[in-house]
Amino acid sequence: MNDVKSILVNGLWKNNSALVQLLGMCPLLAVTSTATNALGLGLATTLVLTLTNASISAFRRWMPGEIRIPIYVMIIAAVVSIVQMLINAYAFGLYQSLGIFIPLIVTNCIVVGRAEAFAAKNGPLLSALDGFAIGLGATGAMFVLGSLREILGNGTLFDGADGLLGSWARVLRIEVFHTDTPFLLAMLPPGAFIGLGMMLAVKYLIDERMKRRAAKPVVVEAAAEKAS
């Protein structure tokens, strides 16, 4: 149970691939112009991470150490191809929006990094959980950044959700405020960098506050021991 909790906390917060490791910056900055695109690529990446981690862990005993990286890439490429075909079949609008960034998951440092750092050393179940947690953490960061940029840029949220979830999802579209002229800075790459910087700053402040709260009982206990 402790292992499961540690994996989830590390993947979602402490070792977040986007906000701590700063991996996968290319899709993170390029695709997060809307919340829907960010959520779509994030979920695809999570699925790839979960399946590749489990597969690599299951076959790790039969992988020669000298050629393990090419084998990882072949497994990742096979899983990405399957995910790409599924998105093409069931979410064609999203497939068109994400474009080249779906096959580029193969070269994403997050996927290869978790295969080498965790899946090659642990069992399939824990490896699948690690991939799921890391992917969910990256998806959360993408979604927050995509939502921030979409709201500031277009004044909407979940615009184009029907491309990901089907025609019923048109009702999810929210017009936060009306604008006749989009705020281009938020929609272009500079806005992605600024938004990511703000998210990094907020995470740093939260972590520092949590550290101070955790340190207070220790200080009080030490003071009580001195007094006695």
UniProtKB/Swiss-Prot annotation:
It comes from the Bacteria. The complex is composed of six subunits: RnfA, RnfB, RnfC, RnfD, RnfE and RnfG. InterPro entries: NqrDE/RnfAE, RnfE. Part of a membrane-bound complex that couples electron transfer with translocation of ions across the membrane. The gene is rnfE. PANTHER family: ELECTRON TRANSPORT COMPLEX PROTEIN RNFE, ION-TRANSLOCATING OXIDOREDUCTASE COMPLEX SUBUNIT E. One of its GO terms (cellular component) is plasma membrane. It is a multi-pass membrane protein. This is Ion-translocating oxidoreductase complex subunit E. Its EC number is 7.-.-.-. The keyword Disulfide bond does not apply. It holds the Pfam family Rnf-Nqr. It is found in: Cell inner membrane. GO terms for biological process: electron transport chain. The chain crosses the membrane at residues 18-38, 69-89, 92-112, 125-145, 182-202.
